[in-house]
Each structure stands twice: as C-alpha cells, then as structure tokens.
C-alpha cells in the first residue's frame, strides 16, 4: 500500500527557518484489511499490501502472530527467517546504492549478487508459513550463501569519499544544525507497547522521536556533504555486515510483558527495525499495528528538522540539498519537496 512523504521548508534571507515533515501512510486502512482474518488469511494478504521489504513484513507478522497464538518457533526456523530478511536487506541495499548513489559496481557483478540473494531466499520461503516446521539440511542453501560471500569478497570497491566526492562537493560549505534524535533501542519496547495498547501509534518514545537502521551508524557531521557521505557509507557497511552474518544471524530480541493473545514481531530491513503488533481474539485478528523505519526516521521532529533548522543555504540550492538529505535518510515511500520563500 502506497504512502507519501511531504517536506516543506520555509526559507528566509538564505536561512532555513522551519521544516515541516508530513508522512502519510495508510496504516488504518491496512489494519482494517487484516482485522477479522485468521492468522493464515492475514499472512496470505500481506504480499499484496507490501512491495518493499516484503520478506521482512512477512517475518515480523509471523513472529507477532505466532507469539499471540502462544506458539514458539524452533530456533532453526527463526534462524532461517532471519537469513531470509538479511538476504532481502542485502539485495535492496545493493540496488539502492547502485541506482541512487551510483556505487561503481559493474552491472554483471550486481546481477550475480542479486541473483544469489533471490536464490537463497527461494530456499527459505517455506519458513514464511504459520507455525512452520524446521527445514531439512539444505546443502544448496549453504552453497548459495557461500557463493554470495565469495562474490562480495571478490569486489574491490573504492572508499565512499572517492566515488561520492564529485556529487557532494557543492555541499561542503553547508553547515548543518543540531544532532539527530536518539537511537531506537529494543529496551524501549515496554514503553512503546504501553503507547500502542492505548491506541497511540506515533513513532516516538515518551513523546521523543527515535532513529533506526544504517542512519544510527552515521556519526553527526558538521557539513551536509560529510553527513550524506556518512549515511551512504553506513548503508554500505550495513550491507557488508549482513553478508558476514548470514551463516549466524542474530536472533530477534525477546519481547517481555506481553498480554494473553498479544504478539509483537520485529525484523530488520535495509532501512532499520520493522515492528508488527497483533492481538488475536479466538483465532482471528482483533488488532494490528505496524511501525516501519520510515515512521521513525521521518518523524515530524526527526533528523530532517533537527539538522536543517537554522542552516544557511543559497536559495537556488535549497531544493537540491533537501532532496539529497532525504535520499540519504531513505524513505520507503515517494516524496515531494516544497520550498516557501518568506
């Protein structure tokens, strides 16, 4: 289901005076499509609702539904599901790096890496069924993961500054504002759960925004050029780390304090942490809530507002700067930029 991001900036005398971030996501409509369904029927609908991060959406939903139903998946099942989301993360990150940031990766090499990700994901697809049993030992999967690691190790990629330098040079003198929000921590889940139970689906903890994903690994930089370079470099490092951890992916964090019939599922995407919260009532969905990385990273008081307010930029460059920073934070929806000259 599509959403849209609108970012409006008020510029006065060459200084950004205000940043208004409006994220429109059809989460209420999505919930209505899933409420009243059985777990199996709801899972069957998910691929029709999401195109980006489709595997992560399935895995987060599965974890939430199974927990709500009182079912604990076997460790090997959870391991395979984490491998599935990591393969999707790798594929989507590589495509983003090449298509948006022009990573100098030869097309044939990219095709090989993407094909290996898809081949591995196909072997793991049976684990996306409700209460899935463990899969038998799969030498073809292990061979695919080994080929992917070898293909990545064989690459000789330049450092981020070398290939991004010409594109970002115009932003070297643009000095950014204050630091971004704090990082979303699974330790905050109990506070977040209390909010969700009350019907508050805002992406914040005690009213304060958080950030997630590769964005968290990017150190706050003084210049816009250095900040964008940090974001893109963090995405590249995140991809490499996912490839390295494929054989032993991290288990999902435990969620304590759940009520009877309530389940929470977490999964990692190329953009950060994805969360589904589900309540089952006699086998059917009574409530369904979702928080995606874009909800966190494009909060109205998120990194865009905090880093851009008070920034001095030439009027003719404001739109281009804003677009580059939005691309660096990486929304999962289409976006539009509006500059108001006060």
Curated annotation (Swiss-Prot):
It holds the Pfam family NiFeSe_Hases. The gene is hupV. Signal peptide: none annotated. One of its GO terms (molecular function) is nickel cation binding. Belongs to the HupK family. This is Hydrogenase expression/formation protein HupV.
């Amino acid at each position: 289901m599509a959403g849209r991001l609108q970012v409006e900036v008020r510029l006065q005398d060459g200084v950004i005076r205000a940043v208004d971030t409006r994220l429109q996501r059809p989460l209420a409509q999505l919930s209505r499509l899933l409420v009243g369904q059985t777990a199996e029927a709801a899972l069957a609908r998910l691929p029709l609702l999401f195109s980006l991060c489709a595997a992560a959406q399935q895995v987060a939903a599965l974890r939430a539904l199974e927990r709500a139903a009182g079912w604990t998946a076997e460790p090997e099942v959870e391991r395979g599901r984490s491998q599935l989301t990591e393969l999707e993360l790798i594929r989507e990150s590589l495509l983003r790096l090449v298509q948006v940031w022009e990573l100098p990766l030869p097309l044939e090499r990219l095709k090989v890496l993407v094909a290996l990700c898809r081949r591995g994901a196909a072997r793991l697809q049976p684990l996306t069924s409700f209460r899935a049993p463990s899969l038998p030992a799969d030498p073809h999967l292990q061979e695919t993961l080994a080929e992917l690691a070898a293909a990545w190790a064989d690459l000789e990629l330049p450092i981020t500054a070398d290939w991004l330098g010409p594109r970002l040079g115009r932003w070297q003198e643009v000095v950014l504002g204050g630091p971004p929000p704090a990082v979303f921590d699974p330790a905050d889940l109990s506070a977040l759960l209390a909010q969700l139970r009350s019907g508050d689906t805002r992406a914040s903890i005690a009213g304060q925004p958080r950030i997630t994903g590769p964005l968290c690994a990017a150190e706050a930089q003084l210049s816009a050029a250095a900040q964008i370079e940090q974001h893109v470099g963090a995405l590249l490092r995140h991809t490499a780390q996912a490839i390295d951890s494929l054989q032993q992916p991290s288990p999902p964090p435990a969620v304590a304090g759940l009520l009877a019939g309530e389940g929470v599922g977490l999964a990692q995407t190329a953009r950060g942490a994805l969360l589904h919260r589900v309540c089952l009532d006699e086998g059917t969905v009574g409530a369904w809530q979702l928080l995606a990385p874009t909800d966190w990273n494009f909060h109205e008081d998120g990194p865009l507002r905090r880093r851009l307010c008070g920034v001095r930029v030439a009027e003719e460059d404001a739109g281009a700067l804003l677009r580059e920073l939005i691309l660096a934070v990486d929304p999962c929806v289409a976006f539009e930029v509006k500059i108001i000259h006060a």
